Regions:
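Secondary-structure edge/capping motif, primarily at the C-terminal ends of alpha-helices
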Residues: 5-8, 37-41, 101-104
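Short secondary-structure transition hinges
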Residues: 31-65, 72-76, 80-85
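A short secondary-structure junction motif
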Residues: 29-34, 67, 71, 93, ...
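Short, well-structured alpha-helical segments
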Residues: 20, 65-68, 83-91, 95
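All-alpha amphipathic helical-bundle segments outside canonical DNA-binding/catalytic cores
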Residues: 16-17, 55-56, 73-89, 107-116
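Hydrophobic alpha-helical connector segments
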Residues: 3-36, 87, 114
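Hydrophobic/aromatic residues within well-ordered alpha-helical segments
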Residues: 1, 22, 26, 56-60, ...
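C-terminal peripheral helix-coil segments that are non-catalytic and often amphipathic
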Residues: 66-70, 74, 104-147
Length: 147
């Protein structure tokens, strides 16, 4: 997964495209993933869960922070955002799809929940030029998925 995240960042033309590449990666992973996996890992596999949390709190937090800084420097994300707070917010919001009380798997698709949360997060960061770029990537994504 680290290689995939790195690939998303290095092949993307900008911070917005990077997030859309990440969303596509998330869709691929979540298609074959049981939402119970984190619950079971936490309950039955302490060491594996601790390793996952370490990965989340160090690697993923850095990836998100770097993307936010990139978006600000490119002019697609607002200058006034608090990167440290929003990076942690984004990190924790990733876990929402696995909260079975909030989003029971019989009613909600984890990939869809994640994509909706990411898109709304992205709109909240965007400048006017960022908003236009988001709309372009969404239209492109919707065209590809409609085929």
């Amino acid at each position: 997964m680290q290689d995939e995240c790195h690939n998303c960042a290095t092949t993307a033309e900008n911070a917005v495209e990077e997030i859309f590449k990440v969303m596509e990666m998330v869709m691929q992973h979540f298609r074959n993933m049981n939402p119970m996996v984190l619950f079971d890992m936490h309950k039955f596999h302490d060491k594996a869960f601790a390793k996952f949390m370490e990965h989340k709190n160090i690697f993923l937090l850095d990836v998100i922070s770097t993307n936010l800084k990139r978006g600000v420097s490119e002019g697609y994300f607002r200058q006034d955002i608090k990167i440290d707070i929003l990076a942690k917010f984004r990190l924790e919001s990733m876990m929402l799809a696995f909260n079975m009380e909030a989003f029971p798997p019989v009613k909600y698709n984890a990939a869809e929940v994640t994509i909706i949360v990411i898109e709304n997060f992205l709109y909240g960061l965007a400048t006017a030029s960022g908003f236009k770029l988001i709309e372009q990537y969404k239209a492109k994504k919707n065209t590809i998925h409609a085929q």
